[in-house]
Amino acid sequence: MNLDNMVEGDDLLKLKDKINKVFFFRICGTGMGASACLLKEAGIEVEGADQSFSPPMSTYLDSTGIPCYSLDKVDKKFLQKYDLIIVGNSVPKVSDHAKLIEDCGVPFTSFPSVLGSFVLKDKEVIGLAGTHGKTTTTYFLTQMLESLGEKPGYFIGGIMDNRPPSKIGESKFFAIESDEYDSAYFQKYSKFRLYELNSMVLTSLEFDHADIYDSVEDIEK
């Protein structure tokens, strides 16, 4: 595994003003698609690719005008026209795709990293975590804040009620679905560790994701 071009934290933040065009490698995942929409809203040119495109995320991505390609069209020369590659956690550590990303010479990171560095800075971030109910509870919290007159930012891991899955918002509040699963093959820890949460709502806690956790106590840690 060659992580010479992997960026996160302060190193990623330093690149922010130099990033004009971003590529999402496996864009059709719910988190990846929602992240792509946030960066597009922030004024960054966004494109992506995946092996297959399934609704509802594929339908929503199509409506945004974000160019999406088949992964079989993606090679080193293709990737080198981008300033940053966002890698989905469906990319295995030992794979041709991982090697392609590592060897193309372009900085790469995960979507939780880019959200933490590019979107959530200076926001009052409320994380919604738990084994069950994260998406629904994030949606409810967003509606509650809106009913109080706020225009919050939000990040929901799904398409609900014909609203975008994510929005930067105008108020200081940002509600974000905070998944305990790993961020990427090069960041084998929970996504919410990269969000710098101000507060967290924990909906439930059960043993899950046996591929990265040994027990419910391991998840608690």
Task: Report the location of each language-model feature.
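Phosphate-binding loop of NTP-binding sites
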Residues: 38-41, 76-77, 89, 93-221
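N-terminal leader/targeting and accessory segments in enzymes
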Residues: 1-110, 114, 216
